[in-house]
Amino acid sequence: MLPVQILKDNAQEERGESARLSSFVGAIAIGDLVKSTLGPKGMDKILISGNPESAGGIKVTNDGATILKSIGVDNPAAKVLVDMSMTQDHEVGDGTTSVTVLAAELLKEAEKLVNQRIHPQTIISGYRRALGIAQESLKKSSIESGDNIRDDLLKIARTTLGSKILSQHKEHFAQLAVDAVLRLKGSGNLDAIQIIKKLGGSMNESYLDEGFLLEKLPGMFQPRRVEKAKILIANTPMDTDKVKVFGSRVRVDGVAKVAELEAAEKLKMKEKVDKILAHNCNVFINRQLIYNYPEQLFADAKVMAIEHADFEGIERLALVLGGEIVSTFDSPQTAQFGSCDLIEEIMIGEDRLLRFSGVKLGEACSVVLRGATQQILDESERSLHDALCVLVTHVKESKTVAGAGASEILMSSAIAVEAQKVAGKEALAVEAFGRALAQLPTIICDNAGLDSAELVTRLRAEHANGRHNMGIDIEKGEVADVTKLGVIESYNVKLCMVSSAAEATEQILRVDDIIKAAPRARAQDNRPC
């Protein structure tokens, strides 16, 4: 029987072993790309965008999610790992590199098993069984924080920051992150924590401000300090709306007509300002521009008017101050005002900002980051954000596990023991899962320039003898009780890392056909030039 073409011309299809090999190669390449960034001694990557002269054109980072988000990936299996890393970053904030590397190692082991003629469904079944064993052993080893949650939060923050650019000042930033998270009082609302980056100074000059900072200033001749502020937050144009919206043109036959038009425009502006002042507010914050004439009217009324607050900033400001963003001013009685005890002007380096103190959302605060270059500030922000996410996750479920490779070897050892009880080819897949987990501490040692074979075998021996808190002391290059060194991690982060990697691997293993649709044909333009 002749083959029948069911796909359009130019559509591409890979089947069976070819499709599986393509998936393995793409996903493993992603893991190899980021594995050199893993651990406290991991290296950084320089990422250059298509236009390196643009703002943010060059990034220096070792954050797995940032690296994978910034590179263009064409392989579909590689895209699965990129999406998985993004999810890990969104859910728990840390472990983005670990989850990618673990998934790549699981696929390497799966590739070996496929080459031994073991069916992918058998591998998936073995991986599922191994995942259950790993999750159970991790749960048994976890410890509740109890009353000493602040100490645990500090240790977790130090561990998280230990592999970041902030590692040299991790004690300072750990205190800063924990103070910020504890102000949230368990709400987990990270929108209440604002991070402001200011060039200049050194990283250890960064600090936590207990007010909300806005990188804007009031208009000329307006109050620079307001107590007991009643704040109206708006997103409204302050010029003549219809002329701007409809792009109207006006033709006049004399200078007097121009003066009449300007007077009419001023009258419309004054009407809008009068409506705003009818709300009896003493502070007006607008997302859009406030022109010179309305600014003068606000100054005459002794009202602080702030213009051009960016959308994200004004959304967060409304949340923090307890107000709502309005766009019309016809019903003052329905407007929800923001409030705070004090608005004042402060200096950070050479820049002036406004600080809102005593805000309605009491847990709100601002972290001011200092640094020598924009790249340092950007990477510091990413690192601090990761730490804040991990701490918020831990506050919700206060369980910790040992870090520095201890948890991975614990799970690997538990899987190796249980694999002996599994019959058939599935046992090979269970053992392979354990070997993949053991690769994480191996890579951490390799990145630190240590003898990974020696250290990991010694670590296995310690765990076989029941000492499950033993991990790798990277600074001394030896096996040690890492809980005594304060190297602990959030149970949720580790659990999410193992589960996500196993699920992504299973999804890729199920693939036996890759179909690329034909490019969309452009309609031919027959119009004359």
Swiss-Prot record:
Highest rank taxon of the organism: Eukaryota
UniProt keyword annotations, A-Z: ATP-binding, Chaperone, Cytoplasm, Nucleotide-binding
GO molecular function: ATP binding; ATP hydrolysis activity; ATP-dependent protein folding chaperone; unfolded protein binding
GO biological process: protein folding
Position of the signal peptide: none
GO CC annotation, single: chaperonin-containing T-complex
Subcellular location: Cytoplasm
InterPro entries linked to this entry: Chap_CCT_beta, Chaperone_TCP-1, Chaperonin_TCP-1_CS, Cpn60/GroEL/TCP-1, GroEL-like_apical_dom_sf, GROEL-like_equatorial_sf, TCP-1-like_intermed_sf, TCP-1_chaperonin
Keyword tRNA processing applies: no
Major localisation: cytoplasm
Keyword presence, Transmembrane helix: no
The family this protein is said to belong to: Belongs to the TCP-1 chaperonin family.
Function per UniProt: Molecular chaperone; assists the folding of proteins upon ATP hydrolysis. Known to play a role, in vitro, in the folding of actin and tubulin.
Binding partners and assembly: Heterooligomeric complex of about 850 to 900 kDa that forms two stacked rings, 12 to 16 nm in diameter.
Protein name: T-complex protein 1 subunit beta
Native source organism of the sequence: Caenorhabditis elegans
